[in-house]
């Protein structure tokens, strides 16, 4: 009971105490939140990449899109596609399988840039590149399913 009384006393004391804020002069405000390393990194970044965006927000600026695509192709050795402001691998992406915008049908998966039914394909049984032994048949994603 004493603990509860003490807790109530602390809450009442804190709630009646005025809150003071410390103001930073306008000239020093920028320096209070950044440092020279951040400034250098941000100034270098502005020339190389588009500004950061909120999650789920896309830019309507075609320059941003072209920059993402060029960066994507430059950094990746695989076949890539610039799709929805991101870089995708066309050898494994089911929404861009083999080429940009080619969507695999429901129940199929993109394996090596080709849409395959992994439930029936002997060369991609259950997952990409899972080859059934000679004489075995892929059924329901398993080699020689009984």
UniProtKB/Swiss-Prot annotation:
The keyword Signal applies. Residues 1-23 form the signal peptide. Its main location: secreted. Expressed exclusively in the stigmatic secretory zone. InterPro entries: Stig-like (IPR006969). Glycosylated. It comes from the Eukaryota. It is found in: Secreted. It holds the Pfam family Stig1. Disruption phenotype: No visible phenotype. Increased exudate production by the mature stigmas, but no effects on pollen tube germination, pollen tube growth or seed set. GO terms for cellular component: extracellular region. Glycans are attached at residues 31, 61, 84. Keywords: Glycoprotein, Secreted, Signal. Involved in the temporal regulation of the exudate secretion onto the stigma. Belongs to the STIG1 family. This is Protein STIG1.
């Amino acid at each position: 009971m004493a603990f509860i009384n003490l807790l109530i006393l602390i809450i009442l004391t804190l709630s009646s105490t005025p809150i003071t804020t410390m103001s930073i002069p306008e000239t020093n405000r920028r320096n209070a939140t950044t440092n020279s390393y951040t400034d250098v990194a941000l100034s270098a970044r502005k020339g190389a990449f588009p500004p950061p965006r909120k999650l789920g927000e896309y830019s309507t600026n075609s320059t941003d899109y072209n920059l993402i695509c060029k960066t994507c192709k430059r950094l990746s050795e695989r076949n890539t596609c610039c799709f929805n402001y991101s870089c995708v691998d066309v050898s494994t992406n089911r929404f861009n399988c083999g080429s940009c915008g080619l969507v695999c049908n429901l129940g199929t998966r993109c394996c090596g840039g080709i849409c395959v039914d992994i439930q029936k394909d002997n060369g991609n049984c259950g997952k990409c590149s899972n080859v059934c032994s000679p004489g075995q048949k892929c059924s329901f994603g398993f080699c020689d399913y009984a």
